């Protein structure tokens, strides 16, 4: 689901994506698979979240997105809303990798995974809900949701037809 999220946000060659240095390999691989550059940033040892100040200092003109990873339902001690506002001001997309945080909340009672442009949840074997190798993406951006639905179904234009006018993969 992380690769689909990155595809939906238009990440590709020449782009740079900031990723915390404490995450599962699927996070940086989803960026590398699309030909973008991964820039690892240190985490805060107390929360295991990316260090927001170090992430801000790592942003360059090529930075297109940042992955926020919540390990085991932990949340940042810093204000995530201010950090996301900062990303928006720099036109940087935010993907929340909430694979291990289904059902967890931020301090303001918003579910982890619902504050960025896209939230990603995993349903693989060791997770809270397991479907084998499934997952889910969430967004409250209708245009982005439509892109995601097309990408995960071979680029099909919708409605079960055989019109494939958009790049996509088999990830139903």
What positions do the PLM features span?
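Short phosphate-engaging motifs
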Residues: 1, 27, 144
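Hydrophobic alpha-helical segments that mediate membrane insertion or helix-helix packing
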Residues: 1, 17-18, 123, 135
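Short, conserved alpha-helix that lines the donor NDP-sugar binding/gating region
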Residues: 2-6
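PLP-dependent aminotransferase-like
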Residues: 7-98, 105
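Structured loop/turn residues at beta-strand edges in well-structured enzyme cores
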Residues: 12, 61, 113-114, 171
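Residues at secondary-structure transition points
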Residues: 22, 46, 50, 110, ...
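Short, conserved loop/helix-junction motifs that constitute active-site signature segments
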Residues: 86-87, 113-115
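Active-site region of PLP-dependent enzymes
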Residues: 101-108, 115-172
